[in-house]
Every structure is written in C-alpha cells, then in structure tokens.
Amino acid sequence: MSTVIYASPIFGPIHSRRLGVSLGVNLMPADGKICTFDCLYCECGFNADFRPKLKRPTKEEVKVALAKVLQQRHGNHEPLDVITFAGNGEPTAHPDFKAIIEDTIDLRNHFFPEAKVSVLSNATMVYKPEVREALMMVDNNIQKIDTVDMEYIRRVDRPQQPSYDVKDVINN
C-alpha cells in the first residue's frame, strides 16, 4: 500500500464519491502524521514512520490559507461542494479545533455558502466538550468506529492511549 502525506494546511481539491468536489483541510504538519490511532490500514502510514519535524499549522495560518484558496476558487467560478477536515492524522486533536471550525464556517458562508463543512474523525476526542461543540456546528460529522470489539481495536486500530475504550466514545 502506498503512503499519502497531505500538504498542510490546505490540499486538493479532490473529487470524493461521497462528498463531491472536496477541498481538504489538514490540521497536522505537512511532513508527517499525528494521530490518536495507528491503524494498520491507514493511507498515511504508521505513526512511527512519519514523525513530523514541523509544527501543526496555527489557527491563523489555516484561516489565511483557506481564505486565499476559497477567494481564488470563487473568483475563477470553480465549483466547491465541501470543505473537509482530514489529512495526516486526527483533525480534532488540534488544540484550536473549535476556533478553526468557526473560522471555516465564516469563510464558507462568505465565499461558498452552499458548500458543506465535513469532518472525518476516528471519534477519539469526542469526550472533550469543545470538540463536541465544534462537531455540532459542521454539516457532516463523520465519525469512524470500526467495531466495538476491543481486542480487534487493539490489534488493528492500535489506539495510542492505553486507557482508550470504545464504550467511552459511544457513551459520549
């Protein structure tokens, strides 16, 4: 399986079968992966193989980069169906996730009010109130839970926190 490390903070657009023309927002460093899981099937590879040297993009860097791309696409009359938070790891792990979502919604409303905002997440951070609040703001809150079998999760998803329990995620 080939490994994909996405540009940061903005990549694409790509054409998604599920979402349409999707502009990606990667809240992780452009040179590596930071994730709360280390899934055997991850397209970004294993955490240990792609430890970043760069820092995560700041809230302001994300806002400026997203505004630039949205303004350019709007000016060129290029379509956009969705702004999707995904990339090199778990987007909700960014310390400014909620504020970045708020900025994104403001920019979307200005340039592409018909576009959706989506988040692809492994659901490991939903226990945080500010993450839950941010996820409630987006149009497509796409949370991934592979199974409720903790043995399978430990073997395949490989949570980075030993205390991880899928039941806690479900109850939140």
Stretches found by the model and what they are:
Residues C42-E43, L80-V82, V148-I153:
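Short, basic/glycine-rich phosphate-binding loops at helix/coil junctions
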Residues T92-N172:
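Conserved AdoMet/S-adenosylmethionine-binding subsite of the radical SAM
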Residues I83-N88:
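Short glycine-rich or small-residue beta-strand-to-loop segments that form or flank ligand, phosphate
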